[in-house]
A protein has these predicted regions:
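HotDog/MaoC-like acyl-thioester-processing domains
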Residues: 1-29, 73-75, 93-174, 242, ...
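Hydrophobic residues on conserved beta-strands that form the core of alpha/beta folds
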Residues: 34-36, 142, 229-231
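Hot-dog-fold acyl-thioester-processing enzymes
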Residues: 1-94, 154-225
């Protein structure tokens, strides 16, 4: 298990991703596991993240924040020579977070990242990037990001019936610069989030919000109402074109919550998720 003594440089890694993206071909995922021990949280950075995602400023880490800490390790793995798919152009389909207990800003963390479960998708191939946070050797947080690489799919997707969105419990104005602001705190400087001209090269009419920002923004709306241990699943649907006006709706489902984010004018879905008590 390769052990990292410092956080990987994302600027250099994204440059590498652009230069090597067209040469990546493969059929197997690497079995590499990256680990970075003794990670401390920068309080200033945490506060900036809280403000961008609209979490309260506390000594407890938002449930989505460890994803940001592990993201450089994910990018390092996805830009290694043995990784079969290019980073640029991979689509974030879904994200699951399992929180066993809250994390505090003064705890020393060990980050661990690996990739698994390569499988067919109607539009190509998909795989799971697994991130873990351990404290004193005990796992306390797990994130599963499912990515799609388009091309050579297994068949056509089933047509989706149009479903009218629920009545929003809140309407949020998403500013045009949220992609750049979230990129500054997350390190995710994929060009589709930064500028409309760059986004058009990838088929988007305008820059789009990060999927993990939309998930974080939704979970910020639940602060003070969630248990200490829970699992939150999200499926990303249509992108949020910036600037935007979005509707947010939440409802109780069994013992947990269901929530949706959608275009406030057209009802086009951006995200659907559930929060389930327990881990």
């Amino acid at each position: 298990m390769p052990e990292l003594t410092a956080t990987p440089n994302l600027t250099a890694l994204f440059g590498k991703a652009v230069l090597t993206g067209f040469t990546r071909r493969g059929t197997r995922l690497p079995d590499t596991v990256y680990e970075q021990p003794n990670v401390s949280v920068d309080r200033t950075h945490l506060a900036r993240y809280d403000r961008v995602c609209e979490f309260r400023l506390t000594d407890e880490l938002p449930v989505t924040y460890p994803h940001v800490l592990a993201f450089p390790l994910q990018v390092k793995l996805m830009t290694d020579p043995g990784f079969p798919f290019p980073l640029i152009g991979s689509v974030h389909l879904a994200n699951r977070i399992i929180r066993i207990r809250p994390l505090r800003v003064d705890e020393r963390l060990t980050l661990r990242v690996h990739v698994e479960n390569l499988r067919d998708h109607a539009r190509g191939r998909q795989f799971d990037m697994i991130s873990e946070v351990l404290v004193a050797g005990e796992p306390v947080w797990t994130g599963v990001s499912t990515y799609l690489r388009r091309g050579g799919g297994s068949g056509a997707e089933k047509a989706r019936e149009r479903v009218e969105p629920p009545e929003p419990t809140a309407v949020w104005r998403v500013p045009g610069n949220i992609g750049r602001r979230y990129a500054e705190v997350s390190g995710d400087r994929n060009p589709i989030h930064l500028h409309p001209l760059a986004a058009r090269l990838f088929g988007f009419p305008r820059a789009i919000a990060h999927g993990m920002w939309t998930k974080a923004r939704c979970l910020a709306a639940f602060e003070g109402r969630l248990p200490e241990a829970y699992t939150v699943d999200v499926r990303f649907k249509l992108p949020v074109l910036l600037p935007a006006r979005t509707g947010f709706a939440a409802s109780t489902v069994d013992q947990g919550w269901g929530f949706e984010l959608f275009d406030a004018r057209t009802g086009r879905p951006h995200l659907a998720g559930t929060v389930t008590p327990g881990a």
